C-alpha cells in the first residue's frame, strides 16, 4: 500500500475523530433540557399528526398544552378519552362536549345544479378552479371532484352517487382536514343536536340562483319572517340559522319555496 494512500486514510480518520469530538462537546454545551411533561402528554396523543389541533403535529400539540396553555382537549382525534387522561396528568378537570362532524352545505349536485362543461382533468377541486373556474353554474357549490376525500387520512369520506362527499361518522375524527381542503368552503362542522340547516352557500340574487340551481337559497326572507324563535336572518341573499335560538320547529323548512332548508 502506497504511503500516499496511508496518509490519506490517516488524515481522513483524524478529521472524523476531531469532528466527532466537536459534536459531542457541542451536544453538551448546547443541550436544552425539555420538560418531561411534554413527552408524557405526547405519549397519550394518538400520533396521527393530522394537524387538526392547529399545530404542526402531535409533538407540537403536546408542547402547546404543557407550556402555552392550549386546552387539554386540543386533539380532536383523541377525543374526550385522551383529553381526560391529559387532564388527569396535568391536574385539570375536563368536561365532555358534543362532537362535531363535517357537514355539506350544498345540495345542488349533479341533478339540481347546472353543469357548464364536462371536466376531464385532474380529480382535484383546487386544480380545476385554477385551470378553468367552476364547472358548475353555481360558483359557491360543491364541485364534486373529491378533494375533501383525498384530504381525509382516516378514510371517513367517500363520494356519493349525487356527486357529494358522504361522511362515515364511525371513522371520522373531526380533525377538520376535509373542511380546510375544500376551496369553496362547502364543508363545515355541525353537531347532531343541530337539527335545522340551510343547504346552500350562495350569496347571489334570487333570480341568478334560480337560473342555475333548483334548490338554492334565493334570499326571499320567508323563513326569517316565519320563524317564531327569531333564529333566522337573511344576509346578502342567504339565510343563516342561529343554532342557539333554533327550536327545530320546522316552520322554516315547510315554507321554503326552494327546499333549501333541511330538518334532520
From Swiss-Prot:
[4Fe-4S] cluster 1 binds at residues 50, 53, 58, 75. GO terms for biological process: electron transport chain. [4Fe-4S] cluster 3 binds at residues 152, 172, 175, 178. It is a single-pass membrane protein. The keyword 4Fe-4S applies. The Rnf complex is probably composed of eight subunits, including RnfA, RnfB, RnfC, RnfD, RnfE and RnfG. This is Ion-translocating oxidoreductase complex subunit B. It comes from Methanosarcina acetivorans (strain ATCC 35395 / DSM 2834 / JCM 12185 / C2A). The gene is rnfB.
Amino acid at each position: 500500500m502506497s504511503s500516499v494512500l496511508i496518509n490519506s486514510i490517516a488524515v481522513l480518520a483524524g478529521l472524523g475523530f476531531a469532528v466527532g469530538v466537536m459534536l459531542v462537546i457541542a451536544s453538551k454545551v448546547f443541550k436544552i433540557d425539555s420538560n418531561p411533561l411534554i413527552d408524557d402528554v405526547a405519549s397519550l396523543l394518538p400520533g396521527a399528526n393530522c394537524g387538526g389541533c392547529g399545530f404542526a403535529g402531535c409533538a407540537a400539540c403536546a408542547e402547546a398544552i404543557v407550556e402555552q396553555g392550549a386546552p387539554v382537549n386540543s386533539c380532536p382525534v383523541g377525543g374526550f378519552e385522551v383529553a381526560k387522561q391529559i387532564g388527569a396528568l396535568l391536574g385539570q378537570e375536563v368536561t365532555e362536549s358534543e362532537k362535531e362532524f363535517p357537514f355539506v352545505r350544498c345540495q345542488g349536485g349533479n341533478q339540481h345544479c347546472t353543469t357548464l362543461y364536462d371536466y376531464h382533468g385532474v380529480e382535484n377541486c383546487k386544480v380545476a378552479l385554477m385551470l378553468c373556474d367552476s364547472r358548475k353554474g353555481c360558483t359557491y357549490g360543491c364541485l364534486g371532484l373529491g378533494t375533501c376525500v383525498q384530504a381525509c387520512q382516516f378514510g371517513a369520506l367517500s363520494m356519493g352517487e349525487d356527486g357529494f362527499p358522504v361522511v362515515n361518522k364511525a371513522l371520522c375524527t373531526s380533525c377538520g382536514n376535509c373542511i380546510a381542503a375544500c376551496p369553496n368552503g362547502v364543508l363545515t362542522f355541525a353537531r347532531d343536536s343541530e337539527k335545522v340547516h340551510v343547504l346552500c352557500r350562495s350569496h347571489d340574487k334570487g333570480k341568478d340562483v334560480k337560473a342555475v340551481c333548483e334548490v338554492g337559497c334565493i334570499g326571499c326572507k320567508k323563513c326569517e319572517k316565519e320563524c317564531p324563535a327569531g333564529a333566522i336572518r337573511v344576509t346578502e341573499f342567504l339565510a343563516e340559522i342561529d343554532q342557539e335560538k333554533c327550536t327545530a320547529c320546522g316552520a322554516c323548512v315547510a315554507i321554503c319555496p326552494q327546499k333549501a332548508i333541511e330538518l334532520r
